[in-house]
Amino acid sequence: GSEMCIRDRSWEVCNKVGGIYTVLSTRAKTLQEAFKDKVFFIGPDFWAGKENPLFSENENLCAAWREHALKKDGLKVRVGRWNIPGEPIVILVDFYPFFSKRNEIYGRMWEDFKVDSLHAYGDYDEASMFSYAAGKVVESFYRFNLTENDKVIYQAHEWMTGMGALYLQKAVPEIATIFTTHATSIGRSIAGNNKPLYDYLFAYNGDQMARELNMEAKHSIEKQTAHHVDCFTTVSEITNNECKELLDKPADVVLMNGFEDDFVPQGRTFAAKRKKARAAMLNLANKLLGLTMSDDTLIVGTSGRYEFKNKGINVYLESLNRLTRDKNLKKEVLAFINVPGWVGDPREDLVERLKSKENFTTPLECPFITHWLHNMSHDQVLDMMKYLGMSNSAESKVKVIFVPCYLDGKDGILNLEYYDLVLGNDLSVYPSYYEPWGYTPLESVAFHVPTITTDLAGFGLWVNSLKGRYSELKDGVKVIHRSDYNYSEVADVIKDTISEFSGLPENTIKTVRKNAADIACLLYTS
């Protein structure tokens, strides 16, 4: 029989930026088990001459083809394995040589597919040259190693990968192409620009909005790829609505994001890691705030990309501010915002204190941030905290700490990886306004941490569909109704939910935690 070969291509292969890294890295093990080494991931080679901690090069892998690709096709690639569960084969491609040919490439894309790259700026050139290079790599590999009898699928993720998929549609039509959009660039932009996305979705014209928002190139590649590939998919019904209205093409299939549970520790290891994470967060609070917070403190957190409105960071802060005046709150609250900003260095004064075993009784200056930012006076989180008068005073029942860096275990302050920290939370809050799927609340419940999300997140809608009603706190996921205009109500419901959680007896919390984990189990791909 013929061989099945899958090519999975994304900007976030061996390159951690956001949720798509999670999508790819957590399904690699399942794909490896099903197809062994017939699955190849293709990513950008940003690390020339430097060590990429996510990539282990192996010069024996595909050695003959690599030499052929370089000599005959002028393609410089490195082959190795991705350091994640499943350890799939990865091809990293050096796409910089294509920059000199970009006008010619864009010209062909216009002639063949009406992709309009005329107004390109920012990351468009870089993403498109990588995408095109990846398409050339697949063509080269296919012609060297395979025949027409071999079934090959090429899956491209997001607009950044569209050009490669279109190149293959024309150059090697026998390769089946799938394009998966995890959001629409125009939908995300409308939402982030304070325009009402949902009530008026039917009235927006994608092409017109692209002009208005100066996003014509990204929108064009996304739309034309959706229309021209063999199969177009997206991650949730809520995003499929955007595809219909803004790309003028519904998805052929809605493929919800699956999930691996390998990185969720079990049994005693889980308990030990949770204890360590809580101790680290409470110790950080002491060193930064000069206060001793009890083991009984309710730790809540949010995390994700720094999209202040879209991710609901604004409404999270609003709710925490209202919580300070809530008479029903039964515990002290320590709230974290783990969102990478324009981060500079870890604070030296805080690093010094963290070296000490002493219990501190005086706060540091700015006792609400762990690393200095390059834009301390123009940061949305800090601006809103200042506007609301949130200063972490000793009298306040709610303390907020902003950790504005990637939690990779080497941040200089907490020095814990994200997954080793998230399980220390008691409750997580993801009140998104724009969230096509919602990995962060899903990761939270996988770590037995109940979560608050909204019905504008694909994940929130999915949980509601499981329950046949709005999911409540007792179910492990509280889904709040959110619309274009009910910001204040959402803030109140978050406040009330945290307050309600603070009064739950221990045995009820155990049940809620179990219910949360059970929801995640339904999405495990293994």
Language-model features: locations:
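Catalytic cores of nucleotide-sugar-dependent glycosyltransferases that transfer UDP/GDP/TDP-activated
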Residues: 2-526
